[in-house]
């Protein structure tokens, strides 16, 4: 058992735990294991995303925009720390230089792009052949 479970069980005396109906025990234990499984899946996804050599900016949004202005047309993955707060797919149009930003969300072991769930980002990349990763500037962490 992890820290949360053991702390919770320490708070409850053995007698109090025995008096809790089994259905509530099952719900409590299932929720704990489900949350652990989700965290494990998110960590796995983060590892896979990091292997794709994303661009890791150490700049604010204005700095990112300035670098995108100088980049050629194409699609870019931009993230600062591979979290749900800031993970984006940017498509820059070569004709007019405008850029479209799509926020990517991590949901357990999946990544959500425009409302569609992908178990692996490689599946999304293979479904979109015109998508490529272009490291504008690569910063070491």
Curated annotation (Swiss-Prot):
Keywords: Early protein. Induction: Expressed in the early phase of the viral replicative cycle. Plays a role in virus cell tropism, and may be required for efficient virus replication in macrophages. Belongs to the asfivirus MGF 100 family. This is Protein MGF 100-2L. It comes from African swine fever virus (isolate Pig/Kenya/KEN-50/1950) (ASFV). The lineage of its organism: Viruses, Varidnaviria, Bamfordvirae, Nucleocytoviricota, Pokkesviricetes.
């Amino acid at each position: 058992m992890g820290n949360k479970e053991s702390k919770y069980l320490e708070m409850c005396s053995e007698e109090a735990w025995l008096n809790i109906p089994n259905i509530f025990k099952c719900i409590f234990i299932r929720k704990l294991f489900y949350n652990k499984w989700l965290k494990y899946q998110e960590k796995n996804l983060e590892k896979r995303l990091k292997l794709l050599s994303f661009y890791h900016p150490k700049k604010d949004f204005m700095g990112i925009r300035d670098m995108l202005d100088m980049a050629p047309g194409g699609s870019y993955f931009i993230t600062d720390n591979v979290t749900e707060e800031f993970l984006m797919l940017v498509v820059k149009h070569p004709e007019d230089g405008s850029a479209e930003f799509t926020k990517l969300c991590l949901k357990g072991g999946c990544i959500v792009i425009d409302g569609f769930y992908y178990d692996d980002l490689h599946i999304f990349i293979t479904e979109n052949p015109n998508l490529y990763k272009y490291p504008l500037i690569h910063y070491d962490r």
